[in-house]
Amino acid sequence: MTTSSHHNKGDNSADLYLASQSPRRRELLAQIGVKVAVLSVDVAEQREVGESPAQYVQRLAYDKAMAGAKLAATQPRSLPCLGSDTIVVIENRVLEKPRDEEDGVAMLLALSGQTHQVMTAVAVATEAKQLMRLSVTDVTFREISRAEAIEYWRTGEPADKAGGYGIQGLGAVFVRELKGSYTAVVGLPLFETKTLLDAFEVPVWQNLAP
């Protein structure tokens, strides 16, 4: 594992470090009033032999949060760090970001007409304290043709998304039913996240000073 740091402008006003380059996670935290500074961490994303999908995604979130917490300890301001990871799971098979068009199309066709699980783990850590939550959401897709899957890939939207689709974008048209947390499918379960932030006394919109 290697780590490096990168900061958003306005770090002095941040209340939380975010160990993620995901614009969706930044947007979701901003949605609930959390000001973040980004730390860039590089954590190997390789599922270990015998590791369940739930164990895998939680380990990645924890490792990212801890890598960020170690970097945070070297920064001028000592703040908790949030790490998160999202995977799509169908029949115990983990679908992460597609490698290329062939992989992306194959993912969509595997999900076509089926119910899959989106697992998002979120961890908040300092070097002294670590807490984590896991959100599991059932998502059911309608039938998708190969031609439609190819057309969707060529929009560019699915390339950087677990499972090869974005529920908050064009990919919403594939979703017939969702049971669980919509924001977890986007990238960060806000209910669970707020619970963690409260434990670290990170302000959200309900307790921001006027």
UniProtKB/Swiss-Prot annotation:
Main localization (coarse): cytoplasm
CC cofactor: a divalent metal cation
Record-annotated active site: D85 (proton acceptor)
Site (Important for substrate specificity): R24, T86, Q168
GO terms for biological process, alphabetical: nucleotide metabolic process
Reactions mediated catalytically: dTTP + H2O = dTMP + diphosphate + H(+); UTP + H2O = UMP + diphosphate + H(+)
Keyword presence, Hydrolase: yes
Subcellular localization, as worded in the UniProt entry: Cytoplasm
Keywords: Cytoplasm, Hydrolase, Nucleotide metabolism
GO cellular component: cytoplasm
Signal peptide from the UniProt entry: none
SUPFAM superfamilies xref list: ITPase-like (SSF52972)
Disulfide-linked positions: none
Highest taxon above the source species: Bacteria
Matching InterPro entries: ITPase-like_fam, Maf-like
Keyword Hydrolase included in the entry's annotation: yes
Enzyme class: hydrolase
GO molecular function, one term: dTTP diphosphatase activity
EC nos: 3.6.1.9
One Pfam assignment: Maf
Function as written in the Swiss-Prot or TrEMBL entry: Nucleoside triphosphate pyrophosphatase that hydrolyzes dTTP and UTP. May have a dual role in cell division arrest and in preventing the incorporation of modified nucleotides into cellular nucleic acids.
Record family assignment: Belongs to the Maf family. YhdE subfamily.
Protein name, as recorded: dTTP/UTP pyrophosphatase
Origin species: Saccharophagus degradans (strain 2-40 / ATCC 43961 / DSM 17024)
